[in-house]
Design a protein with these regions (language model features):
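C-terminal structural cap/anchor segments
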Residues: 177-273
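Signature for the C-terminal beta-barrel architecture of outer-membrane proteins
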Residues: 1-184, 242-244, 262-275
Length: 283
């Protein structure tokens, strides 16, 4: 009903998630570093594409090889055609955190670099393809380097002896770049492959990272349930935001938590807002 029967959608899909972390530091020392990689994939779904003549069903692979591709990456989807990509809708984050512990307080600095494909995962993309015999083939040893812009940076503190404020956090989130505003595969007319328009939380072959219209992950991405046009996609994924939070327990029976977020959104590369939209949330 929400989509008015006019939006693409998936059924019978699966989700795979994985994460791995390393910790550097000694137990009896106040300083340590934690670093890791988180990845997730939507795969194996039946995709329904809306057309003027009704829905067209495309069945993506749902077998043992699909599970393997979801685990290590690779493969392709039924609708990829000549320009093949990884099977499923994959994304992830590089995460690092610095911790410093003292008798009176613990301090933390952390960063989260999110990605939707190789262009943002490694800030590097292969640029030596050639379109030959109806398919893209690797022909040259060329690479395209992307600047690191999209990131979440945060700092927190835990005060062990001050009851009025036990914990404080501040975070900065930037998602406007998305590997740039251009995506094009190499053709005889266009000599470079540019892997921009990462379009966070959206996917050309899947409705994106949501469940019943609610975003799976960062709540600053405007969930599809709030769309007024019936589309099951994220219409605002390019933004800059700040978040702060405080908590404490002045007495044994009084505990509090205060949070505030400010966000400026630009929409998406495909459908930018005419002017930035700003939002302030308090809780």
């Amino acid at each position: 009903d929400f989509a008015f029967g006019h939006s693409n959608y998936d059924q019978n899909g699966l989700i795979h998630t994985k994460a791995g972390y390393l910790r550097f530091g000694k137990k009896n020392k106040p300083f340590n570093v934690e670093a890791g990689l988180e990845m997730a994939s939507q795969f194996g779904s039946d995709h329904y594409t809306y057309t003027s003549e009704g829905y067209i069903k495309t069945a993506n692979a749902h077998n043992l090889k699909s599970f393997w591709h979801a685990f290590i990456g690779g493969g392709s989807d039924a609708m990829d055609g000549a320009t093949q990509n990884n099977e499923g809708n994959m994304l992830g984050s590089w995460v690092i955190r610095l911790n410093y512990d003292t008798p009176k307080a613990t301090y933390g600095l952390y960063a989260d670099h999110f990605f939707e494909d190789h262009s943002a995962m490694f800030q590097l993309d292969y640029n030596g393809y050639a379109y030959e015999d109806g398919a893209m083939k690797k022909k040259e040893n060329k690479f395209l380097l992307y600047p690191l812009k999209d990131i979440m940076l945060g700092a927190d503190i835990h005060l062990k002896e001050f009851k009025w404020i036990n914990d404080a956090v501040i975070e900065y989130v930037y998602t406007k770049f998305q590997s740039g505003p251009v995506y094009t595969d190499r053709t005889p007319q266009i000599p470079d492959h540019i892997g921009g328009v990462d379009n966070y939380y959206n996917n050309a072959l899947a409705p994106g990272w949501h469940h019943w219209g609610q975003a799976l992950g960062n709540p600053l991405y405007l969930s599809p349930i709030y769309n007024t046009n019936g589309e099951l996609s994220f219409l605002s994924n390019r933004f800059v935001a700040w978040h702060i939070g405080l908590s404490g327990h002045p007495t044994e029976k009084l505990h509090y938590r205060l949070r505030a977020s400010w966000q400026e959104s630009l929409g998406t590369y495909d459908s930018p807002y005419c002017s930035p939209k700003r939002n302030t949330s308090l809780g």
